[in-house]
Amino acid sequence: MSSSRNTHWCHRCQRAVRLHGQEPVCFYCGGGFVEELDMAQASPFDMFRSHRGVVERDQTFDLMDAFSVFMRNRLAERSHDREIRGRTISSGPENFPGLAPLLIFGGQVPYRLTGDNAVEALFNGGSPGIGITRGNTGDYFFGPGLEELFEQLSAGTTRRGPPPAPRSAIDALPTIKIAQRHLRSSDSNCPVCKDEFELGSEAKQMPCNHIYHSDCIVPWLVQHNSCPVCRQELPSASGPSSSQNRTTPTRNYRSSSSSSSSNSRENGNERRNPFSSFWPFRSSGSSSSSTQNRGGTRNSDTSDENHNYHQQQHQQSYMGYSGWPFDY
């Protein structure tokens, strides 16, 4: 009953084997705990088999045979429950009928499948013939929905969360001096930069009684109308002047911030703005205005753009924040 094809499964060797002579004995271990395989379908790797002796036979084929038989049985069981979708290739002498599933290693299939090539393809959907399933198009995200997603992601002007704090609300924040009671409480550190307050130094106090360094809380309030700790919003300013003040900041904040930053440099205790990495791009107002200018004059000189860029960088240097796009 010897054959070049593995006809039984040895439970001791845990692989597909051939019988040793006429007895139901494993060819490799000599054990009798073998089970006949369903050979209704040919092994997909018969085309790669060597006609040389058993000693020279590559054991990779044994693993591939066992895997092929296992998956073929699993697919046969599933076919009773539901219809397996896949491309059906007509059976013929040249199509190797019933070759499923098929395991293909990276690169061209050599005479002996050796090396560390990774698995490239697996299964052909249980359909007769050699083939590889295409991916289900329903599993991919494309079409109008994808375009809408890109539009939402590219909408840099879309805001999330509280709006920016009004200028009047930022101006109305009281400035306090750090006393011993502050250092003995949980307010001894600035929640933004985590630096400890110095006795007698100044700090800004929010309506929720949380205190911050002035150069730590002002950049936050320019973007968010709330406390970074408890999220309590600042009172909104009444009147149309608040929105105008937000879009056209005065030079008082720039001069005061510039002086405070220069003093901190002289003392050698300059604090790095923790929010500078959040705004690596230009402000929405400047980007929208530059977009309109480019739309009106597409062929303008690059020197004008460079001049505007350097002017903007000069304005940002008032606060000493790298990447900070506002005039505060």
UniProtKB/Swiss-Prot annotation:
The EC number(s) this enzyme carries: 2.3.2.27
CC annotations in GO: nucleus; plant-type cell wall
Q: In which pathway does it act?
A: Protein modification; protein ubiquitination
Amino acid composition bias (Polar residues), ranges on this chain: 238-250, 291-300
Cystine pairs annotated here are: none
**Could you tell me which residues carry N-acetylserine?**
S2
Keyword Zinc-finger belongs to the record: yes
Zinc listed as a keyword: yes
**InterPro entries under this entry?**
RNF126-like_zinc-ribbon, Znf_RING, Znf_RING/FYVE/PHD
Q: What class of enzyme is it?
A: transferase
Q: What does this protein do, in the record's words?
A: Probable E3 ubiquitin-protein ligase that may possess E3 ubiquitin ligase activity in vitro.
Q: What is this protein called?
A: Probable E3 ubiquitin-protein ligase RHC1A
Q: Which organism is it from?
A: Arabidopsis thaliana
